[in-house]
Amino acid sequence: MTLMEDAKKGVITPEIEAVAKAEGIDAEIVRSCVAKGLVAIPKNARRDTLPVGIGKYMSTKINANVGTSRDCIDIDAEIEKAKAAEAFGAHAVMDLSTGGDLDEIRTRILKAVNIPVGTVPIYQAAASRKIVVEMSSDDMFNAVRKHAEQGVDFVTVHAGVNLNSLERLRQSDRIMNVVSRGGSFTLAWMLHNGEDNPFYAEFDYLLEIAKEYDMTLSLGDGMRPGCIADASDRPKFMEFITLGELVKRSREANVQTFVEGPGHVPLNEIELSVRGMKELCDGAPLYLLGPLVTDIAPGFDHITGAIGGAVAGMHGTDFLCMVTPSEHLALPSIEDIKEGLLVTKLAAHTIDLIKEGPRERAWKQDTAMAYARRDLDWEKQFELAIDGDRARKIRDARKTESDACSMCGELCAVKIVKEAFGEKKEEE
């Protein structure tokens, strides 16, 4: 029996209880949201790991991508990245490996972290053949089953990419066409074989596998726009419509889902994308990479992604995939992972400040920082800071004899007003 089945029957499972406790809300609220598909708790029945709630009333969660490429194969380094991601605050890790022994990398990551682990099975299916288009539908489904058997908690499947998507793409004026790796594999396969996407055509079989292992489906955004000029076009929204239909079928099969999107999007179109996704997908949890709000920032795309993520959070995003400074340039290093996670944590916190559910706890953190700043309590500020070590290093590098910072010293506004109020009270 899956977690969603239990929730529909009114059962508050240990996973639901754990999420409720972590989020500080009533377990019945969590159960109801899981039953309706508004919250997902990605946890494979074969894996004993920390339950993490994603969706309505939940604090905003963060995923970190790790994994080899065919040009950079260092398995130990990727394991260390996964561990570092968990240590730096990621709530989930995805193994996107395409080079080396994919089974070894995946099993080692599953053992190395105590948070949900996701994968993209089509990468392994493609690796089993010399050419991507030569993989069979059996290769695709066998890869999904293998990952499920090994304990993977959620898998990205680009089931919304189908022959209809292909036709929309042909009729579009896109500059970047398709930038999703899994989406490009799928489109190339359909064109070569003259058949529809097996993950779409045989979606019921995919649901059978997911249900057997209580594995969550992350419905991938294979048609996401890869540049600002392509944002909010027909291929993108056509996929959202299809994904919404697949969300409904998944819920009927008692399989948990969340939905990925929406690519590169200018600030003024983020609300349209996110609200559109939420509406078309019946409130399913949304999992976004970014969105990236400009195309001219290689080396700084962790910042463009955090800006987009924060704005998207105002309109319903639940799960942010961190972007690193290496995006569009290279495989990320551990330092890139840390930097990407920190700016994404900032974006997530700004979302939580206004999100129903985590809002009260987030406000307490900011209020505590306000009091610490008012009191010039530096140790408390470092304790509350999102990266206290960095804050301490900056202050220590340019210290002043004043108890204020070296920017203002004795001219510190907080210090002046504090002393002025103190003198007034003494006179009174």
UniProtKB/Swiss-Prot annotation:
This protein's pathway: Cofactor biosynthesis; thiamine diphosphate biosynthesis
Family in the record: Belongs to the ThiC family.
Protein name per Swiss-Prot or TrEMBL: Phosphomethylpyrimidine synthase 1
InterPro entries per record: ThiC, ThiC/Bza_core_dom, ThiC/BzaA/B
EC class of the enzyme, as a word: lyase
Signal peptide: none
Gene name of this polypeptide: thiC1
Cofactor: [4Fe-4S] cluster
Annotated catalysed reactions: 5-amino-1-(5-phospho-beta-D-ribosyl)imidazole + S-adenosyl-L-methionine = 4-amino-2-methyl-5-(phosphooxymethyl)pyrimidine + CO + 5'-deoxyadenosine + formate + L-methionine + 3 H(+)
